[in-house]
Regions:
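Hydrophobic alpha-helical membrane segments
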Residues: 1-342
Length: 342
């Protein structure tokens, strides 16, 4: 299969879902329900803990406040890590469907055994993006200061440029002066953003298949999986970009869900008052966004993610057969059961 033939990839994805002997629709419903209801539960927990912290005062309750604050901070992080494993399991489900293997809801657990490798790969990629951002900020600052874009900034700090103590004093103690400096530096932000994207987008597509490599070869390290992704996507990264762009409607839908989720903040910014308190407003828009996201996932996620799995199959070296011992096996539980029966 040719990665550049997006229609063929989509047809393969639809055929894989339709031909699956398991229950791909129920598996999708379980994934959507767990991910969205879990997010809602975490939001409710944070609200309850926040109210409890606000009403817990006094020196004698400092220990309780510390515990509640720790739980409030740690709960979203723990949930995010759990969702990484669930999302990886979801990718393994789609890869199984492309390989004509039966899937069922428990197949979603297949990503958790490789969660450590996924976290390490994410950390390495995050460190790389941070380095790119640091370079973009430094280069962008040089470009900004060396062009006429910085003339307003020079005019503002001209009188204080030779007196570092006075300059620091003005920056720390004069809010109006600080606002003028920030306003004069506004052109630097698009410069840095463009420089970052120029480098970060190609890097992103170099590592686009890391998750699938981790699933296929669970014993490989994160670095090995990243290297495999680089080799696999070489010469096909533009095809992956066009594949992403072909799903513009899906990503636009996700963006719309994000706008709705922050509808209370947007309306407040516009000066629109709602007939209930801020907590109710938050949850009205939050639940509405989750419902929209659930509908979008239900009708499109199987097709989209299985198409990406088909793209991985098209890029995977054909001389190397698909492994039979990887985490990607949705029927890993069936294999374990068979060994137990023996």
């Amino acid at each position: 299969m040719d990665i550049r033939n997006r229609r063929a990839l989509r047809r393969e994805a639809d055929a894989a879902v339709a031909a699956n002997t398991g229950d791909p629709r129920l598996t999708l419903v379980v994934y959507v329900a767990v991910s969205l209801l879990g997010a809602l539960a975490i939001a409710i927990l944070r609200t309850i803990l926040g109210n409890r912290i606000a009403t817990t005062g006094g020196l004698q309750n400092l220990g309780l406040q510390a515990i509640l604050t720790t739980i409030q901070t740690a709960a979203p992080l723990i949930w995010a890590i759990a969702m990484m494993g669930l999302d990886l399991g979801r990718q393994s489900v789609c890869l199984n469907m492309v390989r004509r293997r039966s899937v069922e809801p428990r197949s979603l657990l297949a990503g958790f055994p490789k969660l450590g490798g996924l976290i390490r790969a994410g950390f390495l990629q995050g460190a790389l993006y941070l380095l790119i951002m640091i370079l973009a900020v430094n280069v962008g600052s040089i470009i900004f200061m060396a062009t006429p874009l910085a003339r307003d900034l020079y005019a503002i700090v001209a009188d204080l440029a030779l007196n570092s103590e006075a300059l620091y004093e003005a920056l720390y103690n004069d809010p109006e002066f600080l606002n003028q400096v920030f306003s004069a530096m506004l052109p630097i932000y698009p410069i840095v953003a463009v420089l970052f994207l120029i480098v970060a987008i190609p890097v992103f597509y170099r590592y686009r298949m890391v998750n699938y490599c981790l699933l296929d070869q669970p014993r490989n390290s994160a670095l090995v999986a990243m290297g495999e992704s680089i080799s696999m996507t070489k010469g096909s990264r533009w095809a992956l970009v066009k594949l992403d762009l072909s799903f513009w409607w899906f990503y636009l839908g996700l963006a719309l869900c994000g706008v709705v989720m922050y509808g209370d903040v947007i309306l407040e910014t516009l000066g629109v008052a709602l007939p209930w308190n801020t907590t109710v407003s938050y949850y009205v828009f939050y639940v509405a966004a989750l419902v929209m996201e659930g509908v979008l996932y239900y009708f499109s996620l199987n097709h989209i993610q299985t198409t990406y799995a088909a793209a991985y199959e098209a890029l995977r070296p054909k001389l190397q057969p698909a492994p039979t011992g990887g985490v990607v096996l949705g029927n890993i539980f069936d294999l374990a059961k068979g060994q137990k029966d023996q």
